[in-house]
Amino acid sequence: MIKKIVASTLLIIALCCAPFTLFAQGAKCTISGKVIDQQQAPVAYASVAIYQDTRPIAGVVTNNEGKFSLQANLSTTEHRIAVEFIGYEKYEGFIVPNKAHIDLGTILLKEAAVEVAEVVVTGKEVAQKSTVEHTTINASANMTSSKGTAIDVLRSASSVSISNDEIAIRGNKNILVLMDGVPTTASDLSTIPAANIQSIEVITNPDASHDAGGTGGIINIISKRNRAEGFSGMVAANYGFNHFANGNIALSYNRPKTSWRFSYNVKYEDDVVNSTLNRKVHSTGYAVFQQMQSTRYTFNNNISLGADFRIDPRNRLSVDAKMIIPRLNIKQDLHNTFADHTEVRYNDVTWNRVNVEGSVAYTHIIKPDVSDITLRASVSKIWGERPSHYFVGGIENNRSVSGGSPFIPSLQADYKRKFSIGTLSAGAKLTYRQNDVYHEFYELTNGEWIYSDKMSKDMLHTELTPAAYAMFSSRIGKKFTYKVGLRGEFSTTTLNSKHDAINERENDFFVAPSLSGTYKVAENQDLSLALSRRIGRPTYPQLIPYMSMVDATTYEQGNMHLNPEKATKVDLSYNLRTEVVNLFVNGYLNYTTDYISQVTKMDGERLITTYANADKDLKTGVELSLKITLAKWFNFTAGANTYYVTTKGVFEGAHIDNSGWTNNSNMMLNFTPWKGGDIQLQYFVTTPQYYPQLTTSLTHQMNIGIKQRFFKGAMTVSVLLTDALNTAKWEVWSHNNLFDLKNNSKNKSRMLWLGVSYNFNSFKQRGGQKTENDRSLIRLGM
């Protein structure tokens, strides 16, 4: 009943804006069709409207069978037809009403990635939605996201584990990061504010249309876009006690033909991390107990600009530019206790970066609702520098300066064509990746700074990857749909180092097939299967060859000679949807060869943490998502990911072995006890995780948030307590053939946050226009 009232109200609003000539007499064209969802079920009470330019001229809602019929005056000009329903992506097509009857057949509505809707007071937002291929996380459904970064948004996905700000999908850290679907050099997700994020897609089993990179999967960050007509905006500020603050402003101006958007975000933090470390090397008997206090100063600025141009009903152009300017300074006080002496050290390390992103996308609709082509171009560039100073006993005895300039441009073309038997998608992409790295290390000798040739390094790495794909999707009968695809990528990699006299070139061809299918067991139940092949090319932190000093005997260094890892992925899922319960269960198997792993080896008396290719890595597990809506004022969401991992390999005498069971779970309770108010309780727990040579300990934390809306939802005030029980920590231990280790650290995780945001004009609609936010008012599910 509520759906019917909402749909009818939206339709009445749209038609009230149509001129009275709508009812003029004349020859008519009858347009009919049927609206269905991805499960082939009819969509009742969907609104269907016909537009001439931007003016609505006719409209109707679908009946219980999803069918509709409406009339428009006969015309030789092109008209736009729009079909909308809450929780689904808007469908748009074009027709020419030049005959007595036009049958549009079936119109498919796809479930929408939920838009951010901070001021909506008539319903609840969907926290996340899962399929056999991916999970979509709604950023604003999580209260902790308002003060945080992309990492805070990702915590709510059980497939994602976060340890010491390192991200893994189902235990694999080799992840491809995209911004609005295009490659980015901004792999540090802690620099991307959640205030700018609409949603994040965690793609665990990508099809052939996606880049084959990232054996762990793909994280696609989708930026906010306000589609309300006219001028609107939002300002927000959050303060965490003590010394954590961030602010955000977002503006948009939308007209029928153009849209403009701007956002700016600033963040300041000074965090204190206290750590202890016990380590003993078997071969030398060397043992140390280390106490360290690190103060982390973070100052980030993010600016984004964008515009959309609806040139005509068949042609659209989008332009976006982003600039991320992160500044990070870490000051470390270390107290080392050895068997025969003690040592006091002090490190001062600064990261300065400027990251620029730009993209252009052009879409041409060749034939409405039949074929289209999209062209995309993007560029991502970082200018980075890292000056470091190392002190012993209050005297600086080492210093270094290093930097790099990762650069990723790409060109892409995608074509889609619908046939009576199915849909064909095809495309081509050209991606170039380059990083020019230098590291200069100096030692104080007899009062003079002497360049260390042994500790200094350089590297120029390039990678050119042309790719092409084709994919076909269709159905067999009324209950089974499938999608089959094939992608080929040919990469040419060069590696140059003047210091090490290296000049290498390597070619590699990788074939990435994909297959997925869904069988509709019942009206509200599905079984799905997905298979794919992936390749994980080494990331720049894994490749960079220079040594970074941790202490007098411990260093970190990349490995220029890593091979790509290759993975086979299989997923089988079951989905049940009712008005009260939404259940998603997914079993998976990931088998990876040449698995890229972090490993610590001996180099004389030094321990060097680097990266190496293990022989193989196998992960098999079950992922579960559950949402229960017991009442309008209360719902419960839970997620769990349990898997068994085993890794095998040897690198320069170090065993790259480990195995064990791991569980990553989360729970969220949502209450709406009064009008405009929300109370949210979150609980996260991660059991020990098993990595080659290392095992992390169990960790858990609880967050509690309260949010209240004022002035008809335009203003929101929030109070948030993170890690209420003060249990969040990072602890790792190891007992291997080279050394024993136990390391733990604790930062300012329990914090009280106060936040306020104000939206102006964001949801004042003109005429019959409807924003994307309307879709999330009633829709339930994951």
Regions found by a protein language model. Name each.
Residues 36, 49, 84-89, 102-143, ...:
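Short, acidic, small-residue-rich periplasmic hinge/interaction motif at the N-terminus
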Residues 53-67:
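Short, acidic Ser/Thr/Gly-rich low-complexity loop/linker segments typical of extracellular
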Residues 151-183:
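Extracytoplasmic beta-strand/coil segments of soluble accessory domains associated
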Residues 182-207:
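Short acidic/polar hinge/loop motifs at secondary-structure boundaries
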Residues 258, 302-326, 349-497, 520, ...:
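Face-selective signature of the C-terminal outer-membrane beta-barrel domain
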Residues 383-385, 492-494, 519, 523-569, ...:
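Surface-exposed extracellular loop regions of Gram-negative outer-membrane beta-barrel proteins
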